[in-house]
C-alpha cells in the first residue's frame, strides 16, 4: 500500500516536471530547474544580533535572544524558565 502511494506520487511529480519542461522554451531547463530546487541561499534568514536555541555562547555575556539564557555548564543558549 505504501509503495503504491509512493509510486503514484512519484508519477505525479514526473508528470508535472515533463509538463513544465514541454512548456518551457529555454534550452537550459534542466540546469535551471536543478538550481531552483537546490538553491538554499534564498532561504537563509537574516542574521540577527542575538543567538538562538543551541547556539554557542559565553556565560556572563548577554548574547542569547530574549527567553534564552547561556548555560554555564554546556555553553550554549537554552530556554530560560525563570526561578
Curated annotation (Swiss-Prot):
One of its GO terms (molecular function) is sodium channel regulator activity. GO terms for cellular component: extracellular region; host cell presynaptic membrane. Belongs to the neurotoxin 10 (Hwtx-1) family. 15 (Hntx-3) subfamily. SUPFAM superfamilies: omega toxin-like. Selective antagonist of neuronal tetrodotoxin (TTX)-sensitive voltage-gated sodium channels (IC(50)=1270 nM on Nav1.1/SCN1A, 270 nM on Nav1.2/SCN2A, 491 nM on Nav1.3/SCN3A and 232 nM on Nav1.7/SCN9A). This toxin suppress Nav1.7 current amplitude without significantly altering the activation, inactivation, and repriming kinetics. Short extreme depolarizations partially activate the toxin-bound channel, indicating voltage-dependent inhibition of this toxin. This toxin increases the deactivation of the Nav1.7 current after extreme depolarizations. Disulfide bonds join 50-65, 57-70, 64-77. Residues 22-48 form a propeptide. Residues 1-21 form the signal peptide. It is found in: Secreted. It comes from Cyriopagopus hainanus. Expressed by the venom gland. Keywords: Amidation, Disulfide bond, Ion channel impairing toxin, Knottin, Neurotoxin, Presynaptic neurotoxin, Secreted, Signal, Toxin, Voltage-gated sodium channel impairing toxin. It comes from the Eukaryota. Monomer. This is Hainantoxin-III 12. The keyword Disulfide bond applies.
Amino acid at each position: 500500500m505504501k509503495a503504491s502511494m509512493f509510486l503514484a506520487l512519484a508519477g505525479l511529480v514526473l508528470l508535472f516536471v515533463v509538463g513544465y519542461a514541454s512548456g518551457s522554451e529555454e534550452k537550459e531547463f534542466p540546469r535551471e530547474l536543478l538550481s531552483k530546487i537546490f538553491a538554499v541561499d534564498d532561504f537563509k534568514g537574516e542574521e540577527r544580533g542575538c543567538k538562538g536555541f543551541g547556539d554557542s555562547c559565553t556565560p556572563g555575556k548577554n548574547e542569547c535572544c530574549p527567553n534564552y539564557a547561556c548555560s554555564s555548564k554546556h555553553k550554549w543558549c537554552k530556554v530560560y524558565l525563570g526561578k
